[in-house]
């Protein structure tokens, strides 16, 4: 069982490992998402939401998997990175379940889990990883039992860029409508590309200048739907093209034959098409996690917890401390084969 509570989503996932045929099955992936009435995520309000829905989400997951807690052999929990109050809700529940049912507790890094669920779904062994979300934007490869970061944002993540822009110009919340981000919906109103700050430094990116410039333009055109659409279109294309550039550079330098897109922004169809085209030009196989697994979810924690369980990555409940800042490249992963 895996518990996710790093940010706006409280989720519980359950996976089953059949050792006789070396097969893993996802039995349940239930969640409840905190959606603020206005503004961004308020950590304490999100934590209160998680505490309110935890019992029901857990019960729904067990019902979906058609099992009871007595059938669960181990508990995995995302201990970071994330928002402190939110992390503590999941950690407290995991510590209680581990102690009460006397089953092992496996610590999971949230970023690692996004990658591992993607590799599992598509059978990838050694991909170039493009991780894009509201909290992360980075390019990584696996090497010497760790994920090594080749490039990353120097300021704000790409998901934060899109959400902040949509919120500041009055389009959000909600940020997603019928599977589309508000920036994508707004971009459909426009047809003209406007030059905006494009900041790439080697394999690193910077989005803050792009956000400032786009907001400045949007303020002028807030009552002109077509011109506002041009700003949205230009913001999206500039940000995504920056990401594709650093991904392509990293792909060539690392010599990988698989490209894996993970994280919440991985559900964006425009970005997926751009990266798929880039990968095909270099003869690489491309895959992006589907919407049900690209956002925060418990199944990815459960699956990564399974990997940890099979490699004896276990922590005592009293030592299962949350880590608000826990970089991807700080985690040693015994299951990675060089």
Curated annotation (Swiss-Prot):
Binds 1 Fe(2+) ion per subunit. It is an enzyme of class 2 (transferase). Substrate binds at residues 131-135, 163, 184, 268. Pfam families: TsaD. It is found in: Cytoplasm. The keyword Cytoplasm applies. Its EC number is 2.3.1.234. The keyword Lipid metabolism does not apply. It catalyses: L-threonylcarbamoyladenylate + adenosine(37) in tRNA = N(6)-L-threonylcarbamoyladenosine(37) in tRNA + AMP + H(+). Its cofactor is Fe(2+). Its main location: cytoplasm. SUPFAM superfamilies: Actin-like ATPase domain. GO terms for cellular component: cytoplasm; EKC/KEOPS complex. GO terms for molecular function: iron ion binding; N(6)-L-threonylcarbamoyladenine synthase activity. Fe cation binds at residues 110, 114, 131, 296. Keywords: Acyltransferase, Cytoplasm, Iron, Metal-binding, Transferase, tRNA processing. GO terms for biological process: tRNA threonylcarbamoyladenosine modification. It comes from the Archaea. Belongs to the KAE1 / TsaD family. HAMAP family: Kae1. PANTHER family: TRNA N6-ADENOSINE THREONYLCARBAMOYLTRANSFERASE. Required for the formation of a threonylcarbamoyl group on adenosine at position 37 (t(6)A37) in tRNAs that read codons beginning with adenine. Is probably involved in the transfer of the threonylcarbamoyl moiety of threonylcarbamoyl-AMP (TC-AMP) to the N6 group of A37. This is tRNA N6-adenosine threonylcarbamoyltransferase. It comes from Staphylothermus marinus (strain ATCC 43588 / DSM 3639 / JCM 9404 / F1). The lineage of its organism: Archaea, Thermoproteota, Thermoprotei, Desulfurococcales, Desulfurococcaceae.
């Amino acid at each position: 069982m895996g518990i996710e509570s790093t940010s706006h989503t409280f989720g519980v996932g359950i996976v089953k490992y059949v050792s006789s045929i070396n097969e893993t099955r996802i039995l349940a992936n239930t969640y409840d998402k905190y959606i603020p009435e206005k503004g961004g995520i308020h950590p304490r309000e999100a934590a209160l939401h998680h505490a309110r829905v935890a019992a029901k989400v857990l019960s729904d997951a067990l019902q979906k998997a058609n099992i009871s807690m007595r059938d669960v052999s181990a508990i995995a929990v995302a201990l970071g990175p994330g928002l402190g109050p939110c992390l503590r809700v999941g950690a407290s529940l995991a510590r209680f379940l581990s102690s009460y049912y006397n089953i092992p507790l496996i610590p999971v890094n949230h970023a690692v889990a996004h990658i591992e669920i993607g590799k599992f779904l598509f059978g990838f062994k050694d991909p170039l990883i493009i991780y894009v979300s509201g909290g992360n934007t980075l390019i990584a490869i696996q090497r010497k039992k760790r994920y090594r970061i080749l490039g990353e944002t120097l300021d704000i993540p790409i998901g934060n860029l899109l959400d902040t822009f949509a919120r500041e110009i009055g389009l959000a919340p909600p940020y997603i409508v019928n599977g589309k981000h508000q920036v994508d919906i707004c971009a459909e109103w426009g047809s003209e590309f406007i030059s905006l700050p494009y900041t790439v430094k080697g394999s690193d990116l910077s989005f803050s200048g792009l956000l400032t410039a786009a907001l400045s333009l949007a303020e002028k055109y807030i009552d002109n739907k077509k011109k506002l659409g041009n700003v949205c279109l230009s913001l999206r294309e500039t940000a995504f093209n920056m990401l594709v550039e650093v991904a392509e550079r990293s792909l060539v330098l690392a010599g990988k034959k698989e490209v894996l897109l993970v994280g919440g922004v991985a559900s964006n169809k425009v970005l997926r098409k751009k990266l798929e085209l880039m990968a095909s030009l270099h003869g690489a196989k491309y895959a992006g996690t589907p919407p049900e697994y690209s956002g925060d979810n418990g199944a990815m924690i459960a699956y990564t917890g399974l990997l940890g369980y099979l490699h004896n990555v276990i922590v005592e409940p009293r030592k299962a401390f949350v880590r608000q800042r826990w970089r991807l490249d700080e985690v040693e992963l015994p299951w990675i084969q060089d």
